[in-house]
From Swiss-Prot:
PANTHER family attached to this UniProt entry: ELONGATION FACTOR P--(R)-BETA-LYSINE LIGASE, LYSYL-TRNA SYNTHETASE
Enzyme Commission numbers on file: 6.3.2.-
Organism: Edwardsiella ictaluri (strain 93-146)
Chain positions recorded as ATP binding sites: R100, N101, E102, N109, E244, L245, G300
Gene3D superfamilies for the chain: Bira Bifunctional Protein, Domain 2
One of the Pfam families matching this protein, by short name: tRNA-synt_2
Listed GO biological process terms: lysyl-tRNA aminoacylation
Reactions that this protein is recorded to catalyse: D-beta-lysine + L-lysyl-[protein] + ATP = N(6)-((3R)-3,6-diaminohexanoyl)-L-lysyl-[protein] + AMP + diphosphate + H(+)
Quaternary structure (record): Homodimer.
Enzyme class: ligase
Taxonomic lineage: Bacteria, Pseudomonadati, Pseudomonadota, Gammaproteobacteria, Enterobacterales
Cellular component aspect of the GO annotation: cytosol
UniProt protein name: Elongation factor P--(R)-beta-lysine ligase
Domain of life: Bacteria
Length: 325
């Protein structure tokens, strides 16, 4: 990149104008439905424990904290928004910057725009319908297909992900030429994620968005376990044209169970040689106080806009990608 060109935005100005219009459409969508827009902090003293996420860290030095207070840039506004739900906010949404210290590429930028919203008294299916409404409005696409995680595996890999053992999963991996990775992998969820990424994702959501729901209970994250089938979690993801767009939950409200999951994450981190993360005690206190039964979803806005504009890379729809920041 020449010095003369490096100052310029990564996205054409015409795309930035279209981006602004889409953001206005999103805000109007929620305003028309009586959902409150909120703003929450971009930094916190606690962070996510998820073994797959790497947060950015910084230090605050001020009165009373001369030694420095460790702060983390938020990977998602989820924890703060749940505290608002517990305080009685009602339905809320947020358009905000989120930060993840991960790869930069076609579908990734370490700083990105997140749309996250929560609906008290919605189950997972009702929220999926609302996500579908938003996608149709922004992308002018057909109504989404819905497919359970189990159905997706059986259809595309001819294996039941809820009952197959690790040997069976490795056999499927071999058919996908993934033996070099799968043969030495002992974690069942990692094997499932590998098969999903290489054996399922490339085949779904080509013509219209697809909702994949009821992920294995072991991948529940912050979602409730299904009361109808304890093998699965009330969790869904949305895919369209090769892009993962959104991740949603029927939210876990049990503080004790959530603490156990955070602690289990930290044990996994320790086993993998990763630093353990501080647990968000404020979130747990909010859950203990009582958060209404809710469903929530996080959607990648830059990816949504990329699809709406038929762009090839995120850098074509954000003003300055990390290499020009």
């Amino acid at each position: 990149m020449s010095d003369m060109a490096s100052w310029q935005p990564s996205a054409p100005v015409a795309n930035l104008l279209k981006r602004a219009s889409i953001l206005s459409t999103i805000r109007r969508f929620f305003s028309d439905r009586g959902v409150l827009e909120v703003d929450t902090p971009s930094m916190s003293q606690a962070t996510v424990t998820d073994v797959h996420l790497v947060p950015f860290q910084t230090h605050f030095v001020g009165p009373g904290v001369a030694q420095g207070m460790m702060l983390y840039l938020m990977t998602s506004p989820e924890y703060h928004m749940k505290r608002l739900l517990a305080a009685g906010s009602g339905p809320i949404y947020q358009l905000c910057r989120s930060f993840r210290n991960e790869e930069s590429g076609r579908y990734h930028n370490p700083e990105f725009t997140m749309l996250e919203w929560y609906r008290p008294h919605y189950d997972m299916y009702r929220l999926m319908n609302e996500v579908d409404d938003l996608l149709q409005q922004v992308l002018e696409c057909e109504s989404a297909e819905t497919l359970s995680y189990q159905q997706a595996f059986i259809r595309h890999l001819d294996v039941d992900p809820l009952s197959a053992d690790k040997t069976q999963l490795r056999e499927v991996a071999a058919k996908l030429d993934l033996s070099n990775v799968a043969d030495n992998e002992e974690d069942r969820d990692t094997l499932l994620q590998l098969l999903f990424a290489f054996g399922v994702e490339p085949h779904i959501g080509k013509e219209r968005p697809v909702f994949v729901y009821h992920f294995p209970a072991s991948q529940a994250s912050l979602a409730q376990i299904s009361t109808e089938d304890h093998r699965v979690a009330e969790r869904f993801e949305v895919y369209y044209r090769g892009v993962e767009l959104a991740n949603g939950f029927h939210e876990l409200t049990d503080a004790a169970e959530q603490r156990q999951r955070f602690e289990q994450d930290n044990r996994k981190r320790a086993a993998a040689g990763l630093p353990q993360q501080p647990i968000d005690e404020h979130l747990l206190a909010a859950l203990e106080h009582g958060m209404p039964d809710s469903s929530g979803v996080a959607l990648g806005v830059d990816r949504l806009i990329m699809l709406a504009l038929s762009a090839e890379r995120l850098s074509e729809v954000i003003a300055f990608s990390v290499d020009r920041a």
